[in-house]
Every structure is written in structure tokens, then in C-alpha cells.
């Protein structure tokens, strides 16, 4: 059965996260993913609130990055929250989207570095006693948590790139591929992930594919599309190589972005083509979105995560997904 989750960002007042988590649990979402963006409220305190006010839904940061903090720090937070939530934590680990703000202009050996970060998290969560000696990360034999980490917590690699997907298939629980609405592109990533699992001698069925499209759901399609166009105008420049795969014009992408950052939202939205909405998002009425989700499942998605901005009215969007979209897939 397909797993369903929703993704929230750190853009909201802290008081709003508990009711959101409780509503998501009531609607039957399986998981809630919290973005850990450098310039917004961090995921860990939000997840702490959610863990103490829910009982069933799984929770996790998607994604944390070793560019912001050492993998051991992320692993310690993850283990502590797994204890608090009675074993409900999951996690995403990736390169991060704001590295340039930290002076990281170009990553060095990004696939190898992220693999090491993953392996170090696994190392300390498993309470291994030997040293960890990597090219990018090290830990002495003395580095071990002074509290129990009772289980192997699922950790997914956040990526929409083929090389990272192949690496993840060899070591991780799977991948989370955000901003993908295209079944064709998703199928390519899945093939890379499964190839990585086979190369590593793993059972391919043991690695899972989470897809996290940007989402805008409303009672009318026009309102949903208007909402998502602004988001796309802002983030399209950061979606390579998927923009090339989708056949989008680089000059139009740049023009939409410049219009957005200059405050001309009307022009920015007008410059976002329909095929961008189709390539990166789940957008429209519940009926529209059901058809799009079915395409992603047919392409190999094990788990669909409804991403931001959710819709012009986020509460209404959650209601529509919870009362119309999820029940459709639970029945089938």
C-alpha cells in the first residue's frame, strides 16, 4: 500500500504546528515531514512539539544537511526524538538548499561526502565502538551516545539527481525526491536507485522511493494554478537538471525569477508555463491530483509526500486531501 505524508516548512508561528500535526493524524496521513531550512525555524523543536501531541503519525526532518551541523549532532537529535515519540521517527539527509549562504559555492565530491555523512549517522546510532575514518568525517572510538538508541531509524537520501540516487540505493533506506511531478523523470531516478541496490548486493525491494512534489490543491483548478506559479517562479532556477529534462527555456526561467524577486508577482506568474506546473507539482482539484498521484505510483513511487505551498488555503487543501484524495487510495 502506498504511504502518504505531508511536508511543512518552518515558516509558521510555533503555535500552529501542533494543530496541523493533530489534523494530519486525524485525516489519516502516515507521516509528517518538516523542512529544516537554514533561514526558517529549525525542524527539531517543531518535531518535538508534534511528537508530544500525536500518537500514531510518523515524523521526521526532511532534510538535514552536514553543511549545517555534523552528522553526529543530527543523529543525536534523531535518537532522542525517536525515544520521545516511541519509535516514530524517520529522517532525510541531503546536500541542503542554502549552502551558498554559508560560503559553500561548489560542493567537493558531494556524493562521497553525503554517503560518509549517512554512514557516520548509522555508525553512532548502531553504537559501534570502532573509529570512523572517512575523507570528510571522522569520529574516535570514544564517540558514543550516553543514552540508548534502540533501533535502526530509517534514513533517506534527499535528491533528484541520478548519481546520488544510485549511491542511496547502495546504503540508505531509499530516496526522497522533492519537486517532481513527472512520472517519466521519477522512473529514471527509481531505476538508478534500484541499480545501486543491486550493485551493493542488496534486495531492491528493501529500498523505497518517496516523491515530494510541490502541491497546490483547491476546489477550483485556476486558483490552485495561480498559487503554484509564484512558488515555481522563485525556485525554478534551482531545479536543474530537471528543468532541462522538462524542456523549459532557461531565459524564461531567469526572467520569471527576476520578476519575482523584484516584486512583480503578476509578471512572474505569467512567465511560468503549464509544463513547469506539470513537471514539478501536484496541482488542481482533488480529482486532478488523484490522476497525477496515480501516475507517480505507476512510475514506482512507494510514498507520496504533498509538498508546499499545499494550496491557496492550506487548511482547506489539507481537508481536501484528507477527505477526498487519501480515501480514494485507501479504497483501492
Locate the predicted segments by residue.
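Active-site-adjacent structural elements that line small-molecule/cofactor binding pockets in enzymes
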Residues: 1-332
Amino acid at each position: 500500500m502506498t504511504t502518504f505524508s505531508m511536508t511543512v516548512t518552518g515558516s509558521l508561528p510555533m503555535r500552529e504546528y501542533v494543530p496541523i500535526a493533530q489534523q494530519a493524524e486525524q485525516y489519516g496521513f502516515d507521516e509528517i515531514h518538516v523542512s529544516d531550512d537554514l533561514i526558517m525555524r529549525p525542524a527539531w523543536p517543531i518535531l518535538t512539539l508534534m511528537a508530544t501531541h500525536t500518537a500514531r503519525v510518523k515524523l521526521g526532518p526532511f532534510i538535514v544537511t552536514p553543511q549545517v551541523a555534523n552528522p553526529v549532532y543530527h543523529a543525536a537529535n534523531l535518537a532522542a526524538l525517536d525515544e520521545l515519540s516511541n519509535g516514530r521517527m524517520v529522517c532525510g539527509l541531503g546536500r541542503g538548499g542554502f549552502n551558498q549562504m554559508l560560503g559553500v559555492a561548489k560542493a567537493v565530491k558531494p556524493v562521497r561526502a553525503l554517503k560518509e555523512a549517512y554512514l557516520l549517522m548509522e555508525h553512532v546510532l548502531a553504537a559501534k565502538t570502532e573509529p570512523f575514518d572517512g575523507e570528510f568525517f571522522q569520529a574516535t572510538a570514544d564517540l558514543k551516545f550516553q543514552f540508548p538508541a534502540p533501533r535502526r531509524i530509517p534514513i533517506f537520501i534527499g535528491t533528484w539527481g541520478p548519481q546520488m540516487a544510485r549511491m542511496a540505493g547502495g546504503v540508505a533506506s531509499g530516496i526522497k525526491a522533492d519537486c517532481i511531478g513527472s512520472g517519466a523523470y521519477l522512473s529514471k531516478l527509481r531505476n538508478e536507485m534500484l541499480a545501486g541496490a543491486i550493485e551493493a548486493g542488496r534486495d531492491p525491494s528493501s529500498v523505497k522511493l518517496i516523491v515530494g512534489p510541490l502541491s497546490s490543491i483547491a476546489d477550483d483548478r485556476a486558483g490552485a494554478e495561480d498559487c503554484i506559479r509564484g512558488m515555481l517562479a522563485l525556485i525554478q532556477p534551482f531545479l536543474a537538471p530537471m528543468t532541462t529534462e522538462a524542456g523549459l527555456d532557461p531565459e524564461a526561467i531567469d526572467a520569471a525569477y527576476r520578476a519575482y524577486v523584484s516584486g512583480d508577482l503578476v509578471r512572474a506568474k505569467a512567465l511560468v508555463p503549464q509544463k513547469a506546473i506539470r513537471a514539478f507539482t501536484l496541482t488542481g482539484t482533488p480529482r486532478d491530483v488523484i490522476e497525477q498521484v496515480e501516475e507517480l505510483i505507476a512510475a514506482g513511487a512507494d510514498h507520496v509526500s504533498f509538498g508546499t505551498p499545499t494550496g491557496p488555503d492550506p487548511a482547506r487543501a489539507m481537508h481536501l486531501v484528507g477527505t477526498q484524495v487519501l480515501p480514494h487510495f485507501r479504497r483501492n
